[in-house]
Amino acid sequence: MAKERWGVAHIYSSENNTIIHITDITGAETIAVGSGGMVVNADRLEGSPTAAILAAKRAAALAKERGITGLHIKVRAPGGHNGPWIPGPGASAAIKTLAREGLKIGIIEDVTPTPHDGCRRKGGKRGRRV
């Protein structure tokens, strides 16, 4: 039986786009990249689960071609002191697709940047009044 070769799938998912970046285990060498904008024509569809599925299929095919058999997954939302800390609609669709394409899934980890009370949010003393 051939030796397993693991990689890391960095999935960045916002409301507007989903980017799947597969690297080697160290994160230094890029193996495959796919994004919503690479597979759909309309800008409004880039963040959809359908675009994430197509991007994940494309990235998985390139990764399997280069000998990757399993993936550890790192999911990231925009985060920071301004953005949402919840991944967009394409994140779960991308993970499911990578599993369906025959790649083994190891660890699924959330790596969204969270503020530790650094910058002040915009909106003033009394907050945003709607």
UniProtKB/Swiss-Prot annotation:
Alphabetic keyword roster: Ribonucleoprotein, Ribosomal protein, RNA-binding, rRNA-binding
Name of protein: Small ribosomal subunit protein uS11
Gene this chain is encoded by: rps11
Family listed: Belongs to the universal ribosomal protein uS11 family.
Record-linked Pfam families: Ribosomal_S11 (PF00411)
InterPro entries noted in UniProt: Ribosomal_uS11, Ribosomal_uS11_archaeal, Ribosomal_uS11_sf
Function of the protein: Located on the platform of the 30S subunit.
One GO term describing the cellular component: ribonucleoprotein complex
Subunit structure: Part of the 30S ribosomal subunit.
GO biological process per UniProt: translation
MF terms (GO), sorted A to Z: rRNA binding; structural constituent of ribosome
